[in-house]
Structure formats: C-alpha cells, structure tokens
C-alpha cells in the first residue's frame, strides 16, 4: 500500500525537527519583540478608556498570552506532529506554553498587586505608567528573565500531572487527590493553617526591619516594646498553628493510608484465580503493603514539606514584590544561577567520586588476585610485575583524588560565591534605593531576610521534587491493581431457594492460561446425581484436581459448559454458589485464627456453637478439639502450624459440612486422617441420612471409599476412559482393574 504522504519536491531540503523547533521559537520571540511589545499597547490605548488603566493592562497581557500560546502550539504541532503527540514533547519545547502564560500574565499580575496594596490611595499604583514601561526594551528583557525560570518550574511540576501509561490509572496526581475522599475538609483546614503560620513566620524579618528603622531614627522605647511584643506574639502563634496543622495532617494521612490499603487489598481479592498464579505472592503483598506504605510515608513527609514551603515561598514572593519590585526581579533573575551552576559542578564531583570508588575496587582486585595466586606469581618470578601493576592503580587513584579535591573546592566555591553574589547584588541595588529614598534601611534589612528565606524555600522545593515524583511512581503501581478489571465473569444473580445438586459436565475442555496450547481436559462429559457418590480416579496429572477446580468456578472452561441444576455455573451469585458447593483438598488452608472462626469461615450469618460442634462431630474433629485447653477458642497459629495434617483436614471437612452444601467435593481430603476419622467420613458419605440431599465428587487414593461409590470414572490424559460401578469395572479388566491390581506402593 502506498504511503499517503506526498513526496517533497525535488531540490527541497526538509529541516530536521530540532532545527525547525529553534527556528519557530526564534521567529515567535521576534514577533513578540517587534509586533506585540509595541503594537498591543497602542491598540488597547484606543480601545479601552483612559479611566480604566488596569483593564487596559490586563487586555494587553491576555492578548499577548493568547498570541504567544497559539504560536507555541504551532511550533509544537510542526515539530512533533499531530496534537495527540504534543504531550510527548521533550525538553524545552514542552515549556513554551507555560512560558507564554508567564510572559502574558507577569505585567497584569504586577499591576493588580500594586493596585491592591495601594487600596484607598487612588492613582498611586499608576497602571498607565506601568503599561508604558512594559513596552520599553528593558522591561522586555526583565520579563523574559523572570518568566524563563517560572516557566521551567511550571513545566517541571507539570510532569507530575502526566497521565499514567498503564493500567488506565489516568492522571496520577488527580488520582492521589481522589484518594483523599472525605478528608478534603481536614486538608482545607490544614492549608488555611499553613497560610496563617507562614504569614506568622514572616513577623521576625518584618519587625527586624521596623526595629532597624527605630534604632536609626532614635525612636521611643514604647515603639521598641510594641514591635518586640507583636513579633513575639506572631512568632508564638505561628509555631502553635504549625503544630496544630502537622497534627491534623498526620491524622488525615493515617486515615488515607488505611483507606487506600483496604481498597487495594479488596481489588486484589476480586481478581481471577489465574492472576494469583501469574504473579508471585511476594510481589502482590509488596504492592498491597510496601507500595502503599511508601506512598503514605511520602505523602505524610514530602507532600507536607512541599505544601509548607510552596505556600511559604508564595507568601514570601508576594511580600518581596510589595517591598521592592526591582529587588525581587533581581532575585528571580539570579535564582537559576544560584541553583543550576552548583548543580552542574556537583554532578562533576559525583562522577569523580564514582570513578575513585571504581579505581579502588580495581586496585583491590589486583592485590587479591596476586595474593590468592602467590604460588603462580612466584613460579613465574613476577613479584615485581604485580607490585608495579598495583603501583599503577594507586597512581590512577592519586590522580582521581586530586581531581576530586579540585571538584570539591569548585563545588563549595560555586555554592558560596553564587549566594554571595546574590547578596552583594541585593545590597548594592538596595543601597542605591536607600540613598535615593525609595526604601528605608529597615525595609532593606527586611527584604534581605525575606530573600534568604525565599531562596531556602526554593532550594527545599527542588530537593523534595524527586521524592514527590517517586511517590507518584508508587501510586501508578497501586492504581494498576485498583483499575485492573478481573478476567473472570462477573457474579451472577441466581439465588434459588432450593437446589437439587445436579451437576452436568457437557463436552468440557480446559487449558490453563499460562499454557493455552496444552489441553488438560478434553471433551469431558458426565453427570453428578443428587444422593450419589461419584468417584474420580486415575493416574497423577490426569486432570482430577482440575475437574474439582472447575466445579468450584475457580476457572472457566475453554470449551463446553458446566451446569448446576441446568444453569451455567457463572450465572449463580458468588456467595450463594460457594455456600452450595463446598470443597476440601489434600492440603487445606487453615487460617491463623481460632478453631471456631476457621469452621465458620466465610459464612455471612454467624452459626451457633451447636451448629459448629455438630459439623465437627460428623468428621471426627470434635474429639481432638474438645481435648484442647481452650476448646474451640484455641488459636491454631499461622496457617494452622499448631495442628497436624490430619487435624487440618478434619477442620476443613467441618468447615465444608457446616454449610450443608448440595455439592460436596473431596479432593484426597482424607489422606491424613486417622482410622477412626476415616471411618466417620465413610459413614458420612454412605450411611448418613444427609447423603440423599447432596451430590458428592470423591477424589481419593483409598480404594475402600472408592469401592462403595455409586459411580466410578477413570480419568486419564484429560479424558474419561471408562466408567461404572466397582463390580462392572473389575469385570471389564480395563484401566481401573489394572490400577486396583497394582501394588499399593507402585506409582499411578
């Protein structure tokens, strides 16, 4: 099939994606410089009345945002293809859209902020003058210098909101917020406390500046006392609010952890049987416990810190803008230098550290090889050669250590010098503002303290970001389980008041999901009649236990159908079906609970002690239970570790009989019972009046039980080879006769 894409004209050279991206971005910025910077203020000066300067500024800013956003979308579309691929844009290209927003909203936001802080003094904000300044080349440069780090941070945080790629988990952060559920009110209260506490923390820098002015102006003692008292009150209030907020947050996260872990465990329990065979129990347990705990710990610690410092940073930024726009711009412009340069040098230092460790390992390997092979070294008279080789490795380590020392010094120097340059720049520009009377000395001191706190907040946010990403990664694994749809059919609705227990296998075939090409059962057709015991015998691996698993609806046939009283098994309601069909295996699972709880396991209505005792008596379990010090309240240990194999089988038989099922499956369920208990089970199957109210599928090695069965089926290779009563099959002298005649210890 021919490609639908038209070939490029001969002689036309298509630009590669990277070149096209750079060209489109440069043209977009040129358009912003040549057209938008000068044209938009003139246009809206004509359209918007002079009496509404703030509206004019916002109209210009929003228009600039819209034009730049359309241009950014055009560059993305031309570079990465269709709109559906824009989400996969890599690197700086993906930051074009947030950059357009930052450039468009910076000036209107500043104008609105100045209007708000000058409320009650009309005209003092002077939005018109701000608009004219915004079209000046210096303002253009400052706007880009401030918008670039903001757009980079926006894009970086936006990567947390990228939809998960698997499991249909959707947006992971939104899913995490959705897990908060009913805790929204508490979290809202927590955020309010964070804001109030952050504002209270800013009392110390604010009043420090006030006290500085008081000292320089030789103010009264009352002013000093009043400022110091207010600072103390606000600081104490901030600490109290932080304590209360942390308590509310940790309590909320505890509730979220319990709720989320319960939801994940419930989702796992709803999965089909094949899921538990294809996934190791340890991996599933790790998802349910460790991943949810990791997520909860990260939410409790990292998200809390992230919110604290994010709110604190925003409050500090607002107060810094209120104090001095020019000093704030200097801070924002120099922040990338403050963090990026030490980060790059730090990577070089870390790389050298790795190389030093590798060289140490190689030198150790040389020494170990020489010392462990001394007879060989001596027989070849190569002692000096090995020593020289070791000295060469030491010389490599020495060279790397020297480089590492230089890198460490440069790393420390860049960290300190970048912070020092920022402080010097702030003090230099601030000193000029103080000299000109634009700000007071106290305001400059306040700003410097705020700037130090703001820098610390940004540094903490950048350090916490990878840990928040890790939490998002953990949440995606958890949501894979929450969103996974079980591959078993949904629970049916049939719950008839009475079941006969007629079971029909109609041409049933089956292959396990992990081996779909290997049929375990092939065209199986037989019937279990109410009031009869049908014994299923055959060699190991013939499919007997698979028949029992299908009858429990643990798997679905790959061919044919399985009917209970004429209705397909999946049409019955899940709980109802497993009350009517009970099974006991050779190694039944007993839970680490009391014997009473194990016998009543899974019943929606708690049985009486008389019913529990009666079920235990029927299978011979009551005799050993009554001899225990705590009787039916005895804890059996993890997985029934305090019980013998026969006792576990007896408890499992009682657990099945208390349900009064219409279909009873015994899959080698008496192999570990003692003689008395086996006799009781034999009487239960063939002499009890209750036998006529249920169908029994018996899989066993005990021929004494098989001989009395109403019908015997010999299964081999997944197919029924012969069937009949014991007498009929012995007369045929076929497969069953050969099995009976074989020595007791011979393999089947």
Curated annotation (Swiss-Prot):
It is found in: Endoplasmic reticulum membrane. Residues 1-15, 77-92, 155-186, 249-298, 350-418, 465-748 are cytoplasmic. Signal peptide: none annotated. GO terms for molecular function: ABC-type peptide antigen transporter activity; ATP binding; ATP hydrolysis activity; metal ion binding; TAP1 binding. Disulfide bonds: none annotated. Its EC number is 7.4.2.14. One of its GO terms (cellular component) is MHC class I peptide loading complex. Its cofactor is Mg(2+). It catalyses: a peptide antigen(in) + ATP + H2O = a peptide antigen(out) + ADP + phosphate + H(+). GO terms for biological process: adaptive immune response; antigen processing and presentation of endogenous peptide antigen via MHC class I; protein transport; transmembrane transport. The keyword Transferase does not apply. Changing residue 619 to S: In allele Gogo-TAP1b. It is a multi-pass membrane protein. Gene3D superfamilies: ABC transporter type 1, transmembrane domain, P-loop containing nucleotide triphosphate hydrolases. The chain crosses the membrane at residues 16-36, 54-76, 93-113, 134-154, 187-207, 228-248, 299-319, 329-349, 419-439, 444-464. CDD domains: ABC_6TM_TAP1, ABCC_TAP. InterPro entries: AAA+_ATPase (IPR003593), ABC1_TM_dom (IPR011527), ABC1_TM_sf (IPR036640), ABC_Tap-like (IPR013305), ABC_transporter-like_ATP-bd (IPR003439), ABC_transporter-like_CS (IPR017871), P-loop_NTPase (IPR027417), Type_1_exporter (IPR039421). Residues 375-420, 453-487 are annotated as: Part of the peptide-binding site. Residues 187-470 form the ABC transmembrane type-1 domain. Residues 37-53, 114-133, 208-227, 320-328, 440-443 are lumenal. ABC transporter associated with antigen processing. In complex with TAP2 mediates unidirectional translocation of peptide antigens from cytosol to endoplasmic reticulum (ER) for loading onto MHC class I (MHCI) molecules. Uses the chemical energy of ATP to export peptides against the concentration gradient. During the transport cycle alternates between 'inward-facing' state with peptide binding site facing the cytosol to 'outward-facing' state with peptide binding site facing the ER lumen. The peptide-binding site is shared between the cytoplasmic loops of TAP1 and TAP2. The nucleotide-binding domain (NBD) mediates ATP hydrolysis coupled to peptide translocation. Two ATP molecules are accommodated at distinct nucleotide binding sites (NBS) at TAP1-TAP2 dimer interface. Each NBS is formed by Walker A (GxxGxGKST) and Q-loop motifs from NBD of one subunit, while the NBD from the second subunit completes the active site by contributing the C loop motif (LSGGQ). Each ATP molecule is coordinated via the beta- and gamma-phosphates to a Mg2+ ion, which is necessary for ATP hydrolysis. Heterodimer of TAP1 and TAP2 (TAP1-TAP2). A component of the peptide loading complex (PLC), interacts via TAPBP with MHCI heterodimer; this interaction mediates peptide-MHCI assembly. Interacts with PSMB5 and PSMB8. Belongs to the ABC transporter superfamily. ABCB family. MHC peptide exporter (TC 3.A.1.209) subfamily. This is Antigen peptide transporter 1. The gene is TAP1.
